[in-house]
Amino acid sequence: MSEQEQFSIVVVKGSVRPGNYTGMAVDLLVDELRKMEGISIEVIDPIGMDLKLPGTGNSGSAERLQELVEGATGVILSTPEYHGSYSAAIKLVIENMGFPSALAGKPVGLLGVAAG
């Protein structure tokens, strides 16, 4: 990678529970990624966003989310495991990425967290 090349990674926190393990795992991941040269990181936390239910209109938060993802080289989605599936929070984030999705054509990494 040349000096001018830079990867831009968007990391999405997929849990809104206070003190959640998913957020802790994301923090560890981001700390490690920031040690690497040529990588910029943007963390998206849905807890501070005004994301709408699908079909009920768009919000400024959704537009900002779409801009960040469209401008990124890649995306990492994190989620706790809830009853064998992903969280409602990460689903809502994905639903607010527009149609066609801002994720289209992007490399996506998944960070799953399960306790117990």
Language model features with spans:
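Short, glycine-/small-residue-rich phosphate/pyrophosphate-handling segment
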Residues: 107-116
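Short, structured loop/turn "capping" segments at alpha-beta junctions
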Residues: 101-106
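N-terminal beta1-alpha1-beta2 submodule of the flavodoxin-like/Rossmannoid cofactor-binding fold
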Residues: 1-99
